[in-house]
Amino acid sequence: MYKRQFQNSEEKPLVYGDVEIHNIPRRRLRGEEEKEGIIAESVFVGFCGTDYTLMNMGREGNLKQKFPEGCNRLINGHEGVVWVPDENRFAIVLIRGGNSYDPTRYTEEETYFEYGCDQADGLFSDKNYYNPDMLLKIPDGYVKDGKIPLSICKKLVFSDPYACMIFQRERMEDIGEAQNFRVKMAQYKCSEAEAREIARKETFDRVCIFGLGTTGMFIGDLIHQRYPDAKIVFVARSEESSPKVSFALKQAGASYVRSAFDTNEELA
């Protein structure tokens, strides 16, 4: 099986070659049963900032806790599109390794992890095993005569990070509402239900987003869609005239501050 993988190595944190794949049972959501995976073939795979971070962790020898059980490597590329031979269909893959928590919802049996791909291989191999419940159906109309356009795959590869940002916006809504509704009850002399709604909306009156990568642009767009009056500021290193900055500002109705300093002293 040909693949691209991360390993703990100062000289070669990212390597290519043959690898053995493992059918490790996984669950879709906490509380559900674990299921063995089914084979799917990689079609289009994304390489994101998380992959870059994992590669650097391997260079520093800190990747062991990310390896799947019984392995000394992690296949990278944790979002993309695959072909499922047994079901004769294309699918979007979601990768989930372990249980995460956020401060408002975690329970005592959950453990924190930085990346959803903890101990779960990605798609940068010819094929691999995936939980069948994590092979999401592609909407009708995109696949024609058994083929899917490359242009569509390029968009679908962003499904997973976009979903992550929907989740993060919801968490910000939860936290803002819970933190401030009593203040709003006193301020506006209103009911608890009305105060919670006010607190949720006012959480996004002023928003500062650090970083203008994929997730930064996505969360800005999602906040603007839900709260069009939000004053959004992006802070990033890109030139003000770059196409990425222009696109993000137009999409989110935002303003921009460039922070291109090499040291904290220069930034201050």
Predicted regions and their residues:
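Conserved small/polar residues in nucleotide/adenosyl-binding loops
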Residues: M1-Q5
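Glycine-rich beta-strand-centered segment in the early N-terminal region that forms part
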Residues: R27-G46, R59-R105, G122, G141-Y142
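Cytochrome P450 core scaffold surrounding the K-helix E-X-X-R motif
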Residues: T50-N56
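NAD(P)H dinucleotide-binding glycine-rich loop of Rossmann-like/cofactor-binding domains
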Residues: H78, V93-R206
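Glycine-rich Rossmann-fold phosphate-binding loop(s) that bind the pyrophosphate
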Residues: P161, G211-T214
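Adenosine-nucleotide cofactor-binding segment
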Residues: V183-L212, H224-A268
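Residues forming the Rossmann-fold NAD(P)(H) cofactor-binding site
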Residues: M217
